[in-house]
Amino acid sequence: MMSLSHASVPHTNPTAPHTLAALLAAGGLAGKRVFIRADLNVPQDAAGDITDDTRIRASVPAIAACLQAGAAVMVTSHLGRPQEGAPDPRHSLAPVGRRLSELLGRQVPLLSGWTEGGFQVPPGQVVLLENCRMNTGEKKNSDELAQKMAALCDVYVNDAFGTAHRAEATTHGIARYAPVACAGPLLAAEIDALGKALGQPARPLVAIVAGSKVSTKLTILKSLADKVDNLVVGGGIANTFMLAAGLKIGKSLAEPDLLADARAIIDIMAARGASVPIPVDVVCAKEFSATAAAAVKDVRDVADDDMILDIGPKTAAMLADQLKAAGTIVWNGPVGVFEFDQFGNGTRVLAQAIAESKAFSIAGGGDTLAAIAKYGIADRVGYISTGGGAFLEFLEGKKLPALDVLEQRAAS
């Protein structure tokens, strides 16, 4: 497993986090108290019913493996944003516990007020500890709370990449004090995939960074400008880069105040012999709506009242060729308004090219996952990151606190 440094790292890294898989293989978990920080933050409807149980299903292998090894298992997660220090039925993990019971084929009791201990979990049994964000001090990474939680366990397992960018008591503090701290299978898989994509990538390395605003992705763009061979921009971000290249974009969404930043990124790439491909054709409309008429235009023919809502077919074909020839692909964001089919061709063509490419591909971000689902390519993307904000912060080159503390523990 690799460390999360963006520099070139060896495959046998002494500071890579310890893993649950290694502990299970060593056979030392029988009778041990194992505390798993999972990501069970699932969407619910107005009645509180779970609408997508993907995260719960993803958490089952780690829990089941610990139970099979004879461990006494405690699982917790956040759910929504409850007020700290008070019970909040709207954010209770009760529905999660019911679904977890079904998936594990056994009762999973839900415990409230658990931070002070006073409960026993027999080996081979599992309990769900109520929403960790109800505990005073969770979000501020309280040292006192972290030590109380660490006293409950012999082994701490972080299996929640989605919160790895937050230093909270259950993601960071407890890992400092637990007798053993390690990465669960979901977290370990994310570390491996991200390390493979940016630590030692097979070249050419192509990144697709798309979205409505340059401002929200500027740090990512600057970070990747030093690393990638082609930086494909899409959506409103591409409009700003087109402006920077001296092209007209009509009344399209753009950020003129960031033109200097866009030009700087183009220059950094060019100095390295890398490129930011600027579209040669685009799909325009006079309004932003599901029924808007789409018109394919050469980039030099965009009218003052046009809105650019997708890349054109020539651009899509050109970029698809680059993706098919890539060694590594990092994908964050659809290149057009793919929710409206007449503006979805660019994203569809690129998605298909990623699926057909021999490159190792990693994709992340909510809109990207929706596009992957729409075009049915999930089983042909090398790795789909569920991290959201953590995935973006990794692309920015930031240290993720939850991973950093596990690396520190491994090093010591």
From Swiss-Prot:
First-level EC class: transferase
Binding site for ATP: 217, 339, 365-368
Pathway: Carbohydrate biosynthesis; Calvin cycle
EC number: 2.7.2.3
MF annotations from Gene Ontology: ADP binding; ATP binding; phosphoglycerate kinase activity
Keywords: ATP-binding, Calvin cycle, Cytoplasm, Kinase, Nucleotide-binding, Plasmid, Transferase
InterPro entries, per database record: Phosphoglycerate_kinase, Phosphoglycerate_kinase_CS, Phosphoglycerate_kinase_N, Phosphoglycerate_kinase_sf
Residues bound to substrate: 39-41, 55, 78-81, 133, 166
PROSITE patterns the record matches: PGLYCERATE_KINASE (PS00111)
Pfam families: PGK (PF00162)
UniProt-annotated location(s): Cytoplasm
GO aspect biological process, one term: reductive pentose-phosphate cycle
Disulfide bonds, paired cysteine numbers: none
Reactions this protein catalyses: (2R)-3-phosphoglycerate + ATP = (2R)-3-phospho-glyceroyl phosphate + ADP
The keyword Cytoplasm belongs to this UniProt entry's keyword annotation: yes
GO CC annotation terms, alphabetical: cytosol
Assembly information from the UniProt record: Monomer.
Family membership: Belongs to the phosphoglycerate kinase family.
Name used for this protein in its record: Phosphoglycerate kinase, plasmid
Biological source species: Cupriavidus necator (strain ATCC 17699 / DSM 428 / KCTC 22496 / NCIMB 10442 / H16 / Stanier 337)
